[in-house]
A protein has these predicted regions:
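Phosphate-binding site recognition
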Residues: 1-152
Length: 152
């Protein structure tokens, strides 16, 4: 199966002004599948982080939100080094960890060489926009349910 949005993800990857990406969409439209498939096709490695497993991840985002610290901690969690340009970092269910959303600002400003994509439900992300959302520091794409062309 091929989702048409993968072409926009590829443009995002190749952009010289890339910011962390937030992939929005309703539940169960395929956000996670699309990001993992994109990572498999266009990156050497994918560091997949599911924030529904909060207990194991809260300590990473509890204090210092510097990209260097987060990358070091995620590399330990992932079990191998996270390399700029070759590793796609996927933050799934990002609405469950508001400080992970906040950290995107620092990745945009201090470490734009890292490819970070976030997936989350529209409602969950919208609930956090007023307090910690990194306005202007992220790119957005919206995934809709399968089109007829994609279905065929």
């Amino acid at each position: 199966m091929e989702r048409l949005l993968i072409h926009q993800l590829l443009k995002w990857k190749e952009s010289t002004h890339r910011k962390p990406l937030v992939l929005e969409g309703a539940r169960q439209v395929g956000k996670t599948w699309l990001l993992r498939e994109f990572g498999k096709k266009y990156f050497k490695d994918v560091c997949y982080i599911n924030f529904e497993q909060k207990d194991r991840l809260e300590s990473i985002f509890a204090g210092d939100l510097s990209p260097q610290f987060i990358i070091e901690q995620l590399s330990i969690y992932h079990g191998k080094p996270i390399k700029p340009q070759t590793t796609l970092i996927v933050f799934d269910e990002v609405q469950e960890m508001p400080r992970a959303l906040t950290s995107l600002k620092y990745f945009c400003e201090e470490a734009p060489e890292y490819a970070i994509c976030c997936a989350g439900s529209l409602l969950g992300i919208a609930l956090h926009e007023g307090t910690s959302f990194p306005v202007g520091k992220t790119d957005f794409l919206h995934l809709y349910p399968l089109t007829f062309k994609e279905f065929l």
